[in-house]
Amino acid sequence: MTDYKNTLNLPETGFPMRGDLAKREPDMLKNWYDKNLYQKVREASKGKKTFILHDGPPYANGTLHLGHAVNKILKDIIMKSKTALGFDTPYVPGWDCHGLPIELKVEGLVGKPNEKISAAEFRQACRDYAKEQVEGQKADFIRMGVLGDWDNPYLTMNFETEAEIIRTLGKVIQNGHLYKGSKPVHWCLDCASSLAEAEVEYEDKVSPSIYVRFAAVSAAEVEEKFNALGKGQGALSAVIWTTTPWTLPSNRAIAVNAELEYQLVQLGNERVILATELVQTVQNALGIEQIQILGSAKGGDLELIRFNHPFYDFSVPMILGDHVTVDGGTGLVHTAPDHGQDDFVVSKKYGLEMAGLVANDGKFISSTPFFAGKGVFEANDLVLEKLKETGALLKLERIKHSYPHCWRHKTPIIFRATPQWFIGMETQDLRIKALSEIKSVRWIPSWGEARIDKMVANRPDWCISRQRTWGVPMTMFVHNETEELHPRTLELLEDIAKRVEKAGIQAWWDLDPAELLGEEAKTYHKVPDTLDVWFDSGSTYASVVEQRPEFNGKSTDMYLEGSDQHRGWFMSSLMLSTATNNKAPYKQVLTHGFTVDEKGRKMSKSLGNVIVPSEVWNKNGADILRLWVASTDYTGEIAVSHKILNSAGDTYRRIRNTARFLLANLNGFDPKNDLVNPEEMISLDRWAVSCALEAQNEIKEAYDNYQFHTVVQRLMRFCSIEMGSFYLDIIKDRQYTTKADSLARRSCQTALWHISEALVRWIAPILSFTADEIWGYLPKLDNRAEFVFTEEFYDGLFGLDESDKLDDTYWQQLLKVRAEVNRVLEQARNDKLIGAGLEAKVTVYASEEIRPLLEQLGNELRFVLITSQVVVKPLSKADVAESELTGLAVKVERADGEKCPRCWHFATDIGSNKEHSHICGRCIENVEGNGEQRQFA
């Protein structure tokens, strides 16, 4: 028997079936950077509308975790998809390089500044350490396939950037937003420095929970206010509740709410003042069975009544404050202006001075009675003993509650009033302006707007000064006596900025004030503080975006970070940009959630659920990591596990297999010579291209709306359903068995070529390495760009002509018919009636609505159903039972005739040609004749 294998057009491609990404990706990366891919993308986009995504700088310390990978990959997907959508997308990655975490690391390496080494040497060690960390993180970001100007990133420690940060401080001063004051700030005892809101984490802590008596100076005065003269018996006290006994030495008042009702209550053998709504709660907490209400009064009537401090020899007033609620406690609030924001504000209204009892190290100063030299948390028990001694302790318990901790040391922090520099939220209407600007920004997801709006509405003034060594200095001079800024501050700041531009921040520390101030140097001194690192990163809209030539003076389109940055970078950037430019620094803000395991738990070493990004790309490849990120709805928590990554691998294989099938069947196709005009193409091929156009429109829209999981879902629908289980299955017979240069085959290859050109661009933003690999295997074109990343989405797709009878509705109906036929064929296979579908003869009983659709294809219906023979008959009650598709019934029999060894179809004409006695007439026509003619499929 003749071997007809060499008469078939078998698929062939060098594109491997296995991705082997972990091995291949590094070689591709080398090629990208050897050939300056990023610059090629920039050159190809020259003159197009700019889209600027400003990179929020990660901290230059430690190895990258999955959260970093999610963030950078999302940014990269956006930048690559925006390029494909026709934008110029310069991307300048950056790093945050100053601040405490680096100081602590360097202290561990070289010791504290001014101990083993000088402050100048310490700063240089910090700079060297940060640089080393940047290089390590940079290599990992590049390995993820993230494109950007990695040779010229921005670092907040670059001399030019440090200078611009100082200039931004100058604008803040110029616009009247900076002031110095003693206010309570978050204070870390281990850092010996104030902390920003974003540097505070809340963890559970066990604290004493105490009810404390403040005895009335004049019981008669209180009785009169409550209209209870002579009522009740025993001592009369105001009762407060607190979980911070150590703040009681600093108590200077008791706050009540003017609008709340209070009652004088007989509790056993004493009388106490409580908010009416909390009497029952306190009674239960104290375990007292019977009480008596002696009188009532509004909080406003109790103003300025005095009560004795529980263990010091002075009295404190009762004052009014809106912050007092009945959410807990007693409705009377212990007020220590040094140690609480509300306490400070309300005390200021009454002219109450701060106590100033706690030093920088968290210990009570030497003049503090009873507690001198004791640490605040150590003093808790001592205060309790003192309260017991004076009879002021009404009740003591221990409770577990949420308490602020230092993000770095994981230790409890305190509120402490210290002299600091602040950006005032009310000065020059900064809060009002910022709230207005929030409304002009597109927040993705939309709930981000309400979140940051609430934070801005309620945030205190921003303490921007820090008592650190490694940071941008607050390069100001203040008067020795008045503490006022030098009148030429703005001019001096610019002079210092120019020096910093040349020599870095050390120029300030080395500066002799006399160089700039002359004789005035005797009456002015340098401010010793550094700027909050959130000021560094928050001012990058000015120090980076406004300075880099590739941004061309354009404002930023998007900030994209984790949802914790509403109170971090988004907030600091909004505050500074509004303070200096009267506008938000961004047009859109996109946030993503945090990574958790498949059970929704945080990643932690103790749970053993930590997945390191490098593990993923070393085992699976970076494209799998990228596909996992794109497949997830990033607006909520982002689940990851080895099982989930394996699932991403399955999705990847489906896409890769589709691409491989396309490439293999483009074997021998030259677009310059073999392309078929749309109107000459076979109907099914035209439909396949129109499917690709519809998919592309949806994919472009999803990319434009940053809905990458929708992109992946649409890709899978296209690859698996529209192509894999329908079109690509049907065309195999035509591809392999018709004449190599026939219209039937070239029409199909034309469709596959258009689809390949589109598909490779669809996946490029997500599966960057795989897209680059596919690009190299596509049929050669004289004008083909070297890299897919310089290209826009494919513009060669076309829809069905309006005059085309076999429109999308028609083919969608055929899809349903084919699915039903496949179901019945599967049943016949299970019943051992047939093996492969080509062993079947199918009779389709169709309703009057469906039958004309099937008959339109004539003899080509069998190619769509992938059976050897098909008969279409009218549906009647006498026929076999209707199928799951209304208006259709299917009957399966074994096909007539013999199996053709060339096309595998069963035919009754095998042996009718003596020269080719083993193959069917159709194959003889394709081997010897002019080739079979196809019109529809």
Curated annotation (Swiss-Prot):
GO terms for biological process: isoleucyl-tRNA aminoacylation. The keyword Metal-binding applies. Monomer. Zn(2+) binds at residues 900, 903, 920, 923. One of its GO terms (cellular component) is cytosol. This is Isoleucine--tRNA ligase. It catalyses: tRNA(Ile) + L-isoleucine + ATP = L-isoleucyl-tRNA(Ile) + AMP + diphosphate. The lineage of its organism: Bacteria, Pseudomonadati, Pseudomonadota, Gammaproteobacteria, Pasteurellales. GO terms for molecular function: aminoacyl-tRNA deacylase activity; ATP binding; isoleucine-tRNA ligase activity; tRNA binding; zinc ion binding. It comes from Histophilus somni (strain 129Pt) (Haemophilus somnus). IleRS has two distinct active sites: one for aminoacylation and one for editing. The misactivated valine is translocated from the active site to the editing site, which sterically excludes the correctly activated isoleucine. The single editing site contains two valyl binding pockets, one specific for each substrate (Val-AMP or Val-tRNA(Ile)).
